[in-house]
Amino acid sequence: MTTTTLLSESTNNSNNTNNNTNNNTNNTMNNNNNNNNNNTIGNNNNNNPEYDILINILMLGDEEVGKGSVARRYTEGYFPINENLYNIEVDRKHKDIKDWGDGLIKRKDPNKPVIGRLQLWNFHMHKISDIPTKQQYRETNGFILFFDVTNKSSFLQLSSLIELVRAKCADENNNFNCQSNSRNSTNYNRHSVGNHCPNSPQKGEKENNTHSSTAPPAPPPLPPIVIVGNKCDDVSNTVVDPIAAKKYCDSLSIPLLFISAKTNENVNEAFNILQGLIIKQMKIKERERQKLLKQKHIKKDVNCNLM
């Protein structure tokens, strides 16, 4: 599936509504009331007339990898210079996209376009285990993991971030409970992406299990994730080997893009790819839901005939 067919994206400001809310009063991810005094991630249950479906995207990575700059470049079209973004505990930006979902949402009026609101979240944290909480992770639809190509330690941090996302998103059944709700559609639960653990055996490798006749349990699956290497414009100071980075991400079946918030290189592409993954999983989950409803209906008819 190519993400360009899923999204109708334009750089024209007349087609996109951008918003910045920076408030530290409430860092819980519950219901989004479209209130600037409530920094929340979660389901849109308020029939907001501005959009049809809310898609929460959590940006994770070391400090100073450029998460805030990328968010501003994507939602507002500029690169922040001389802006102090590090005192903002919860940095929230959003962008509205016309014709979102590739037919995922069925409108009562087919001539009215579906508006998807991408809400970007950036939590500034001293320790990656501090915030967001497990519930907050599970209320997120997709993740962008950042590293700075001029800072190798930020790249080495990726494995910890991936396992953190894996652990905090999965419930006891290794499923994902994150939802995005629409005014004119079914509630869609996020379906897991079939990625494998970095330590799991790859194709062609044999599993070392000589001491046990029982295979270890499979690791919890990963939600939709895109990894980005920011500051790719700074070629002279690049220390992360792009070939090694691609090999690592390929081993996880996670898309990798080298981007630049400064020059806008591949910024839109990264978000488009993530949205494509989210839409794909929503469609899979909806097909599963319809199949389950059909099975229940058949079972109900059988029970009625037996009476």
Swiss-Prot record:
Keywords, comma-separated and alphabetical: Cell membrane, GTP-binding, Lipoprotein, Membrane, Methylation, Nucleotide-binding, Prenylation
Renumbered residue ranges of the record's region Disordered: 1-45, 175-223
A matching Pfam family: Ras
Topology in the lipid bilayer: Lipid-anchor
InterPro entries membership: P-loop_NTPase, Rab, Small_GTPase
Positions that bind GTP: 61-68, 122-126, 230-233
Pro-piece positions: 305-307
Cysteine methyl ester sites (modified residues): C304
Predominant location category: membrane
Biased composition (Low complexity): 11-45, 175-185
GO cellular component labels: plasma membrane
Biased composition regions of type Polar residues, renumbered to the chain: 1-10, 186-202
CDD domains xref list: Rab
Protein name (record): Ras-related protein RabR
Organism: Dictyostelium discoideum (Social amoeba)
Gene that this polypeptide is encoded by: rabR
